[in-house]
Amino acid sequence: MRRGNIILAELKHTYFAGNQNEFRSPRIASYGCGLIGFADLLLYLMEQDWRTGGAGGLGTRGGKKYEEFISRLDRSFARVYSHIGLNGFSMAIAFNRRARKRGWPYRARWAVPRKKLPEIICEMLENDIPVILSVGPGFHDRRGEHGVALYRNGRRTEVRARDHYVTVIGYEEDPESGERSFRIVSWGKEYRISASEYLNGSTGSIPFLGNLFSNVLYIRKTV
């Protein structure tokens, strides 16, 4: 994966990503990736409101106000549990409650058919909606390594995502090889993951459950 890729779809504005590792709560630092991704998604949509004259978001990620926002979500909308984190179905319910409260024209559900993932991701990005994507259990490559490799600056890093939520902010294609990649944010940094590695990765001994654990929060516009 390298720079100079063809952009197939991407968010229209800068996406600010928080970092769960910066939180003092051991529970959020260890299991809060879904909560952080969910909070950043809400703030991005709140900032869209601000651009169109509505109530805005925080404008940045980090600091006391951001921590307070995360804590309120954890208490009221999207509780993080130790050793479990935040599951996708709870995330969809929490998003729909929040959308109704703010009058947003969106509806969310967890998981879509695996073959439709690229299409759904493109649809959401074209509608300027960040895509929360989970990398679930059962992912491994031919060498037996678990998780999905993360790339930065065109090079494979030593970091791998497994049992983890990331946020897709772009979908790209290498003009020479035709290889496609998802541009993501995680732990407050931007990476890329191979679309084929993610889409074709093992889903474990029970594919149905693997598909549920490795999927997206699908948010569609209702108007």
What are these regions (language model features)?
Residues 2, 126-128, 178:
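Short, well-ordered loop/turn elements at secondary-structure boundaries
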Residues 7, 105, 181-183:
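Ser/Thr- (and often Asn-) enriched beta-sheet segments in non-cytosolic proteins
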Residues 78-172, 222:
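Predominantly the structural core of cysteine protease catalytic domains
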